[in-house]
Amino acid sequence: MNAPDKFSQLMSLTREPLPASRKIYVPGTQADIQVPMREIMQSNGEAVVVYDTSGPYTDPNANIDVRQGLPSVRSPWIESRGDTESYTGRTPFALDDGLKNGDSESLASLRVQAAGLQRTPRRAKAGANVSQMHYARSGIITPEMEYVAIRENQKLAWMEQYLGNAEREARLAGNSFGANIPKIMTPEFVRDEVARGRAIIPANINHPEVEPMVIGRNFLVKINANIGNSAVTSSIEEEVEKLVWSMRWGADTVMDLSTGRNIHTTRDWILRNSPVPIGTVPIYQALEKVGGVAEDLTWAIFRDTLIEQAEQGVDYFTVHAGVRLAFIHLTANRMTGIVSRGGSIMAKWCIAHHKENFIYSHFDEMTEILKAYDVSYSLGDGLRPGSGADANDEAQFAELRTLGELTQQAWQQDVQVMIEGPGHVPMHMVQANMTEQLKACHEAPFYTLGPLTTDIAPGYDHITSGIGAAMIGWFGTAMLCYVTPKEHLGLPDRDDVKVGIITYKIAAHVADVAKGHPGVRARDDALSKARFEFRWMDQFNLSLDPDTARNFHDETLPKDSSKVAHFCSMCGPKFCSMKISQEVRDYAKTRGVSEEQALQSGMQTKSEEFRLAGGEMYIPISPA
């Protein structure tokens, strides 16, 4: 990183706690299980506790040096299991960073600046399996499993005041479409879900900085944000800052999709400074190593890239193993052909050599590599539809069925798997995608890009996809990959990233509410209560984006006095429905009658006024 001071400048905002918030840590059964959450203090003295993905960056007591990386959360747990070993690891090459000349001054400078981020890699001892799935199937509850159980519950106690009305709870009960969501998440439930393959805990043993999280149909819906440099834009500083910015607003995982130079070094900075799981698409870096010529790719180059990234600590790999030679012709009559970058790379290789996809052919060998580091599979949908016209066609579902077969192959070695999904799908076809995935992929977690429900809104595809994301999240998708306003148009900047994340946090939340996930609606009720009581600052602070909520309010009512006013700019002081409703309640309370009786009394009073005024609908106004 060639400008640490620039990075510090970029990071200034992301180190501040969100308004009225403080970091709290909920302890587990052993001293080193400390699960971070965000506590939002309200002006009425009540506290709301919410899931927090921001890591130590919003903890003012945390000392962070990005040149050294974050402190380790999991190292003691990994070492105590006694099934891993440290080893020298592969030697980084200039080609890993997209450079042909190992003596390049820029490369040397990059390596010096990243020296504090280097770690000795670990791997499974000979004959051992270090995956969370293997432990789960062996009946072992790991600290990671206990950690995510605590995290998923979000400190249930504060929610009770909002969930105690039995009539309301019955009326608002969700529909989980066959999911099995318990009222309280226990470590044993987490273990069982991971053992069954219905959930994954992406946590490479070489990413000890990660704060464990779980992805599965029976847990909170998660969201992923994409970052990454390209050959034409962005720097390492910008990508690391974008990582921290993404986590601040709620990204549960982040994918590094870098395709330009300095890929390896950028990944060092990202992994060592990330408390959330990091995913990659290894074929992107492998392609850089062969000068961008897909036909020159080989299994040996791809295998070396997998090991390189596993040693660095990547938590999940997107691999396009389902793009088989026999399926490529199915895309010939599509409106938009093959739109997946990784899918098109593998399709081109298959056609050029007229051979089966080497990722598919070497799948078991690849699984052996992932097993040694506990890297999870994210089986890529290389034949996903790139337009509504191509949704749910045979190319898409032929690949999906193959991914289901590969899932079972991976499970034979206890390697964790999630399945990637579309894409572009009209609303009336969204549920069929979830139904087909559950059937073909044996309930492995589904991870979808949207889907976008219409193709007519470039510049607003965060909205077109947010609609599909909310729907498919309700139907059972475990993680939603965000889409920004720049989708199809360009690389997103930090503002686009924030808009995309907030859009998808909304989609994930409404899906959880619709599924009837225990307790999630309590935050809605807390904000509604604050709104009804005109606690403006609490409204802002309880929202997903306090800054924007406050700014929008202040555009029309900027004075501090407006933040205690019992009205807003929409209706004004005389026509505020909530103010009128409160006045009815106050009237009833002072007279010792019910609200219904107060309303009836008011109606009788107004009726008498109408009669005394002559009983006419329109009363002429006398000239002054």
UniProtKB/Swiss-Prot annotation:
Its cofactor is [4Fe-4S] cluster. This is Phosphomethylpyrimidine synthase. Substrate binds at N226, M255, Y284, H320, S340, R341, G342, D381, G382, L383, R384, E420, Y447. The lineage of its organism: Bacteria, Pseudomonadati, Pseudomonadota, Betaproteobacteria, Burkholderiales. It comes from the Bacteria. Binds 1 [4Fe-4S] cluster per subunit. The cluster is coordinated with 3 cysteines and an exchangeable S-adenosyl-L-methionine. [4Fe-4S] cluster binds at C568, C571, C576. Homodimer. Catalyzes the synthesis of the hydroxymethylpyrimidine phosphate (HMP-P) moiety of thiamine from aminoimidazole ribotide (AIR) in a radical S-adenosyl-L-methionine (SAM)-dependent reaction. Zn(2+) binds at H424, H488. The keyword Zinc applies. One of its GO terms (cellular component) is cytosol. It comes from Albidiferax ferrireducens (strain ATCC BAA-621 / DSM 15236 / T118). The keyword Magnesium does not apply. Residues 75-99 are annotated as: Disordered. Pathway: Cofactor biosynthesis; thiamine diphosphate biosynthesis. It is an enzyme of class 4 (lyase). The gene is thiC. It catalyses: 5-amino-1-(5-phospho-beta-D-ribosyl)imidazole + S-adenosyl-L-methionine = 4-amino-2-methyl-5-(phosphooxymethyl)pyrimidine + CO + 5'-deoxyadenosine + formate + L-methionine + 3 H(+). Belongs to the ThiC family. GO terms for biological process: thiamine biosynthetic process; thiamine diphosphate biosynthetic process. GO terms for molecular function: 4 iron, 4 sulfur cluster binding; carbon-carbon lyase activity; zinc ion binding. Its EC number is 4.1.99.17. Keywords: 4Fe-4S, Iron, Iron-sulfur, Lyase, Metal-binding, S-adenosyl-L-methionine, Thiamine biosynthesis, Zinc. It holds the Pfam family ThiC_Rad_SAM.
